[in-house]
C-alpha cells in the first residue's frame, strides 16, 4: 500500500526551518500547524464567511479587469478568475452553509436558517430544510446507498478498484460530461423552484431571478454576467464540488454498508493534508547547491500546485473533515489547531490522514489500487 508522508518526521515538521514569516502560509496550505504553535489570528465564523465573499469578489474584479483590457490579457485573467470565483462560492457553500445545517454558524436556529437561505438563494443551492435533511442522512449513513453523495458519485461512473490510469480517464470524462453538468444544474433549478420549498424561500428565488433578469435587461451586461457569474457558478462550481466530493470520504471501503461500527465509520473519513516534506539535506561539496534547487522546486509546488488546490477545491476547514465527523460541535473555524489537540487526547485513534494533492486524495477516496490512508499520530517538534 502507498502512503504519502509515511516516514518520520511528519511532513509539516520538515518545514520548521523555512522562514518564520511564511509559516502561516504553510499552515494554511498544508492544513497542519507546527507542533506546539498557536494561531496568530483566532478565526470566527463571520471571518470565514467574509473570506468567501472576498474571494468571490476579488475573482470577479480580476475577470472584469481582463474584460476591460481585452486581447490576450482578457483571456488569461478570465481563465484565472473562473476557478477563484467558484472557489469563493464553494467556500460559502461547503463551509458556511454546511455549518448552518449543524447550527454551528451562529447561536440561534433562526440565524442559521436566515444565513443559509440567503446564501443558497444567491448560489442556486437547495433550500435549508431539504438540504439539512439530506445532510443529516449523510451523517447517519455515510457512504451507504442512502447517502445522496454516494449516489451522486455513482452516477458519474465512480467505482472502487480502478487503476490510476483508469481513474484518470474517468475523471476527465466526468469533468467534461454534458450529462454530469446538466444533471447537477437541473437539480439546482428543481430544488429552488419545483421541489415545493417554503413559500418565503420560493419568493426569494423568484425575486432573485426577476432582479437578475431586470438588471441585465437594463444594463446590457449579459456578457460579463455570463462570463464572471454563470460560467463559474455552473461548470467550475460543479467540477470543484465533484473533485472535492470524490475525496470527502473513502466511499467504497465497506461496500456501502449501512450498519458500521464506530471504528469502521472513523475509517471512512481522513484528513486531506496538502504538500510534501521539504527535501532533506545532502552532503558533499555540491550538496548545498543541489538542495537549494530542490527546495526552490519544492516551494514552486507548494505555491503553484497545492495552494490553488486549497484556494479553489479544498477550501476552509474541509482539510480536517475527519474532525467534523468525529466531533461535529468542534471549533470548526480553527480546526487545524483543534485537530492537533485531539491527537493528544483519548480520541486520537479515531483520526486518519493522507498527504499529497488532489490526485492522491481522490485516489484514496475511491480505493484506487495501492492507495490508502494511515492513522494519525501526535505531532512532535523537531529541530530545524
Predicted regions and their residues:
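Functional transmembrane helices that form membrane-embedded active or gating regions
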Residues: 296-320
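Juxtamembrane helix-capping/reentrant segments at transmembrane boundaries
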Residues: 105-123, 150-159, 260-301
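Generic alpha-helical structural context detector
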Residues: 120, 244-248, 319
Amino acid at each position: 500500500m502507498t502512503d504519502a508522508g509515511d516516514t518520520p518526521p511528519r511532513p509539516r515538521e520538515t518545514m520548521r526551518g523555512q522562514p518564520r514569516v511564511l509559516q502561516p502560509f504553510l499552515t494554511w496550505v498544508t492544513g497542519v500547524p507546527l507542533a506546539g504553535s498557536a494561531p496568530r489570528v483566532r478565526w470566527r465564523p463571520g471571518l470565514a464567511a467574509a473570506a468567501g465573499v472576498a474571494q468571490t469578489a476579488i475573482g470577479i474584479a480580476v475577470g472584469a479587469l481582463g474584460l476591460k483590457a481585452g486581447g490576450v490579457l482578457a483571456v488569461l485573467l478570465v481563465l484565472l478568475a473562473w476557478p477563484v470565483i467558484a472557489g469563493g462560492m464553494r467556500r460559502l457553500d461547503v463551509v458556511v452553509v454546511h455549518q448552518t445545517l449543524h447550527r454551528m454558524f451562529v447561536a440561534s436556529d433562526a440565524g442559521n436558517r436566515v444565513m443559509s437561505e440567503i446564501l443558497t438563494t444567491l448560489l442556486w443551492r437547495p433550500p435549508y430544510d431539504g438540504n439539512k435533511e439530506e445532510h443529516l442522512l449523510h451523517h447517519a449513513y455515510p457512504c451507504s446507498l442512502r447517502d445522496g453523495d454516494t449516489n451522486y458519485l455513482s452516477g458519474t461512473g465512480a467505482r472502487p478498484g480502478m487503476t490510476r490510469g483508469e481513474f484518470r480517464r474517468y475523471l476527465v470524462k466526468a469533468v467534461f460530461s454534458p450529462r454530469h453538468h446538466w444533471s447537477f444544474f437541473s437539480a439546482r433549478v428543481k430544488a429552488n423552484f419545483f421541489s415545493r420549498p417554503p413559500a418565503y424561500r420560493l419568493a426569494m428565488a423568484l425575486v432573485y431571478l426577476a432582479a437578475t433578469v431586470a438588471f441585465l435587461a437594463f444594463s446590457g451586461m449579459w456578457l460579463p454576467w455570463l462570463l464572471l457569474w454563470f460560467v463559474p457558478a455552473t461548470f467550475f462550481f460543479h467540477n470543484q464540488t465533484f473533485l472535492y466530493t470524490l475525496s470527502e470520504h473513502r466511499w467504497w471501503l465497506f461496500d456501502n454498508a449501512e450498519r458500521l461500527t464506530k471504528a469502521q465509520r472513523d475509517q471512512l473519513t481522513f484528513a486531506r493534508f496538502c504538500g510534501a516534506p521539504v527535501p532533506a539535506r545532502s552532503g558533499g561539496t555540491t550538496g548545498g547547491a543541489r538542495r537549494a534547487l530542490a527546495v526552490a522546486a519544492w516551494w514552486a509546488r507548494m505555491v503553484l500546485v497545492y495552494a490553488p488546490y486549497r484556494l479553489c477545491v479544498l477550501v476552509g476547514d474541509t482539510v480536517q473533515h475527519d474532525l467534523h465527523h468525529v466531533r461535529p460541535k468542534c471549533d470548526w473555524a480553527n480546526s487545524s489547531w483543534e485537530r492537533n489537540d485531539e491527537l493528544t487526547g483519548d480520541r486520537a485513534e479515531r483520526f486518519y490522514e493522507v498527504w499529497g494533492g488532489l490526485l492522491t486524495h481522490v485516489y484514496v477516496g475511491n480505493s484506487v489500487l495501492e492507495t490508502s490512508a494511515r492513522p494519525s499520530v501526535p505531532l512532535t517538534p523537531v529541530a530545524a
